[in-house]
């Protein structure tokens, strides 16, 4: 990242079991690929928190594994999961949105 760069570069490795986010050549997020949605389809929990809810959901909450066999099975859930995991990336100077590299 250049001195006057207006973006933060992060890399996202979407995996069926875990999703990893790398920032500044360090793994900053390594979470299970799970998402929990409320009855309106809004994000309730992501990663480890959503995995702990799996199989124990409240009637208004459902857990989803958006990737199956290395392929995105639920695009909406995958997008919500990625957005939730990106929010976990801590940065003191988060003035600009990240530039993503998905592998």
Which residues does each PLM region occupy?
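A short acidic-Thr-Gly-centered motif at the start of a beta-strand
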Residues: 1-5
